[in-house]
C-alpha cells in the first residue's frame, strides 16, 4: 500500500550487531534503533555502577516487567523482585505507578543504586562485556554489517 511506502520502518529491540542490522533490513526495515549498546558507551551519562551491572548480566538475567503500564525489560534486582511480587499478586496499574513514581529509573541508571533502582536494559545485555566509545561501536557495527552483506552475496546462488 502507498501508506507503507511513505512511512519509514525502523526496527528496534535486540539489535546489537551489524548482522542483526542486516537481518532487519532484509525483513524490510529502512533503519534500526540501537539502545542498550549505546546506553553503556563511554559517552553515556549512565552511572558506572549501572554500566558494570549491565556488563555482568548473564543470559536470562533480564525479565520483562511492568506489563500493565509499559512493558519494560529489567535486570533482576531487589526492585525487580518488588515489581514481580506485586504483579504476581495482581496489582493494578496505579499501584505499580506508585512504586515507579519514586524516581526508580533515575536511582538505578543515573545514580547507580543497584538494589532499589530500576535497571532498565534490553535483552541483549548479556552480549555487552565492556565499555566502548560511540566511535568504536559504530566501527564495529559497520564492519560486521559489511562482512554480513558479503557473506550473504557470496553464498546465494541459483
For every predicted segment, state its role.
Residues 1, 5-10, 16-158:
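Conserved active-site-proximal phosphate/metal-binding subdomains
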Amino acid at each position: 500500500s502507498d501508506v507503507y511506502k511513505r512511512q519509514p520502518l525502523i526496527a528496534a529491540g535486540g539489535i546489537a550487531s551489524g548482522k542483526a542490522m542486516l537481518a532487519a533490513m532484509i525483513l524490510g526495515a529502512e533503519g534500526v534503533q540501537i539502545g542498550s549498546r549505546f546506553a553503556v558507551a563511554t559517552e553515556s551519562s549512565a552511572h558506572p555502577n549501572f554500566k558494570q551491572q549491565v556488563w555482568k548480566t548473564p543470559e536470562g538475567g533480564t525479565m520483562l516487567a511492568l506489563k500493565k503500564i509499559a512493558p519494560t525489560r529489567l535486570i533482576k534486582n531487589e526492585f525487580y523482585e518488588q515489581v514481580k511480587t506485586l504483579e504476581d499478586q495482581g496489582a493494578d496499574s496505579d499501584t505499580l505507578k506508585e512504586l515507579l513514581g519514586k524516581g526508580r529509573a533515575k536511582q538505578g541508571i543515573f545514580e547507580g543504586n543497584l538494589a532499589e533502582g530500576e535497571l532498565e536494559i534490553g535483552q541483549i545485555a548479556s552480549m555487552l562485556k565492556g565499555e566502548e566509545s560511540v566511535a568504536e561501536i559504530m566501527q564495529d557495527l559497520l564492519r560486521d554489517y559489511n562482512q554480513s552483506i558479503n557473506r550473504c552475496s557470496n553464498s546465494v546462488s541459483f
